[in-house]
Regions:
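Short acidic, glycine/proline-rich loop/turn micro-motifs
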Residues: 44-46, 87-92
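Hydrophobic positions on the long internal alpha-helix
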Residues: 9-13, 17, 60
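Catalytic loop of short-chain dehydrogenase/reductase
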Residues: 18, 22-55, 61, 65-68, ...
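C-terminal helical subdomain
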Residues: 69-72, 76-84, 91-133
């Protein structure tokens, strides 16, 4: 359902983003698809997960090519690591700062949204320094 959900969401929100594009020239409308490293390479026992993530990456690339010329910033963001949320508070790691801060993710997403049209980023990774990739 990963790519299907992204497809339906994109289909619903892109007309709204196109409407707001001219009203907000300083910060172009931004659509960020959050994904995982599985979008780049599959892993053993993760075929169904990787398939959905590969499809989401292709969807975001296609939408970026279709709607980028119309001023819509479409990004495929890879989050690779454990996010430091209440559900993962008790998870212990060998190194400090091994979990990704939600605030750091938000800062990165805000940076994407505030990029000028002359230098859109279409794909990027967020991972802690100690993540093996």
């Amino acid at each position: 359902m990963t790519s299907l959900g992204g497809f339906h969401f994109g289909r619903a929100v892109l007309p709204l983003l196109l409407e707001t594009e001219k009203a907000s020239p300083e910060f172009p409308p931004t659509l960020i698809f959050t994904s995982a490293t599985a979008a780049m390479r599959g892993g053993a026992n993760f075929a169904s997960f990787a398939t959905g993530k590969f499809a989401m990456r292709a969807l975001s690339q296609s939408l970026a090519r279709e709607f980028g010329p119309q001023g819509i910033h479409v990004v495929h963001a890879i989050i690779d690591g454990v996010i430091d949320i209440p559900r993962t508070k008790e998870w212990k790691f060998d190194k400090p700062d091994a979990k990704i801060s939600p605030e750091a993710i938000a800062d990165s997403y805000w940076h994407l949204h505030t990029q000028p049209r002359t230098s859109f980023t279409h794909e990027f990774d967020i991972r802690p320094y100690c993540e093996k990739w």
